[in-house]
């Protein structure tokens, strides 16, 4: 069968409260949507196949954060505490999502990130 559209698995990350915040009032939820062959495949992404990591430049803090958020799934609630202890002195805080899509025959893997 011929399947039309982009054969690359891709994800988008949306922010429930937009992208610009005052640091003191930072709160949002990041949500992943997936696309394969121009079709929404979000429902087929298992929460256990989503891995969130954070990059603040502080490897120890970022690793601890990743362990604490290992079971998060497709939606990641964030508060100012998730930006790391040195956020006000940093150039940004990056949140990275790595996602695996299993279709029964193939596994597709992709990643995307956003920076606050």
Where are these regions (language model features)?
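Surface-exposed receptor/substrate recognition regions of extracellular proteins
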Residues: 1-116
């Amino acid at each position: 069968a011929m399947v039309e559209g982009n054969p690359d698995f891709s994800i988008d990350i949306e922010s429930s409260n937009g992208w610009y915040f005052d640091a003191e009032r930072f709160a949002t939820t990041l949500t992943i949507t997936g696309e394969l062959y121009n079709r929404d495949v979000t429902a087929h992404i298992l929460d256990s196949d989503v891995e969130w990591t954070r990059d603040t430049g502080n490897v120890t803090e970022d690793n601890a954060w990743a362990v604490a958020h290992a079971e998060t799934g497709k939606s990641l609630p964030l508060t100012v505490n998730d930006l790391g202890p040195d956020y006000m002195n940093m150039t940004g805080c990056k949140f990275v999502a790595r996602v695996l899509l299993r279709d029964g025959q193939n596994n597709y893997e992709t990643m995307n990130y956003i920076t606050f």
